[in-house]
C-alpha cells in the first residue's frame, strides 16, 4: 500500500496568539484548535499532515528547505534552527519530501522575499491562507510576495480557510 500523501501546514509570526490576539479580526479559535481540526480532516482525506509554527523567518525557510529534503541550517551552537510537531521526522532527520505546503505566512506575506524564494526553490506546490481578509485591511497588507506563485490563495474565511486549503490540496492539486 502506498504511503499517504504528505502535506505541511506552516504558520508564521504571531499565529501562535490566535484566539487571544485581536479577536475582532482573527476570532477566538486557537492555533491548536485549527491544527487539531486539520489533523482530523487530513485523516479523513487519507493525507498525512505535519504542522509547524515559528515567529522567525529563518526557521520557516529552513522548514521549507527540509520539506524538499535539504538539511536544515544549523545555528552557531550546532543545533537545528527549526522544529516540527510530526513524529519520526524533523530537523536533522534528512529527507522529508512533501506533496504540498499550506502556508499562512502572517506578516511575512508582505515582507519576505526569502520565504518566496524558498518556496520557489523547492518546487513544492503551495496554498497561501489568511484568517482575515487582507484586502479589507491596511494598505500595507494588500501586497503578497507569495500570491502570484501560489496554486491558490484563501483569505477572509477565518479558521475555515485552513479547511478549504486542505480540501483543495487533498482533492484538487496534482500531488
UniProtKB/Swiss-Prot annotation:
The record marks 21 as: Transition state stabilizer. It catalyses: 3-dehydroquinate = 3-dehydroshikimate + H2O. The keyword GTP-binding does not apply. GO terms for molecular function: 3-dehydroquinate dehydratase activity. It holds the Pfam family DHquinase_II. Keywords: Lyase, Quinate metabolism. One of its GO terms (biological process) is quinate catabolic process. The active site is at residues 26, 130. Pathway: Aromatic compound metabolism; 3,4-dihydroxybenzoate biosynthesis; 3,4-dihydroxybenzoate from 3-dehydroquinate: step 1/2. It comes from the Eukaryota. Substrate binds at residues 104, 110, 117, 131-132, 141. Its EC number is 4.2.1.10. HAMAP family: AroQ. Homododecamer. Adopts a ring-like structure, composed of an arrangement of two hexameric rings stacked on top of one another. Is involved in the catabolism of quinate. Allows the utilization of quinate as carbon source via the beta-ketoadipate pathway. Belongs to the type-II 3-dehydroquinase family. This is Catabolic 3-dehydroquinase.
